[in-house]
Amino acid sequence: MKLTCVVIVAVLLLTACQLITADDSRGTQKHRALRSDTKLPMSTRCKLKGQSCRKTSYDCCSGSCGRSGKCG
């Protein structure tokens, strides 16, 4: 009986500590993971060879936008 009460009190204390620290740590994460550049091509549609492109947007499937403004 005593052991059961001790275990219940310990679980309640640990749960309370978890809830207190979770509230205090919101928005204080220092090193957030940045979105990987490798995920960008997978999440957006790329343009096929010969379609118009911009060198600054990196939207060609081949990865290269030619001088003429078309995917290479």
From Swiss-Prot:
The modification Cysteine amide is found at C71. The keyword Methyltransferase does not apply. One of its GO terms (molecular function) is calcium channel regulator activity. Residues 1-22 form the signal peptide. It is found in: Secreted. SUPFAM superfamilies: omega toxin-like. Expressed by the venom duct. Keywords: Amidation, Calcium channel impairing toxin, Disulfide bond, Ion channel impairing toxin, Knottin, Neurotoxin, Presynaptic neurotoxin, Secreted, Signal, Toxin, Voltage-gated calcium channel impairing toxin. Pfam families: Conotoxin (PF02950). GO terms for cellular component: extracellular region; host cell presynaptic membrane. Omega-conotoxins act at presynaptic membranes, they bind and block voltage-gated calcium channels (Cav). This toxin blocks N-, P- and Q-type calcium channels. The presence of a 'disulfide through disulfide knot' structurally defines this protein as a knottin. The cysteine framework is VI/VII (C-C-CC-C-C). Belongs to the conotoxin O1 superfamily. This is Omega-conotoxin SVIB.
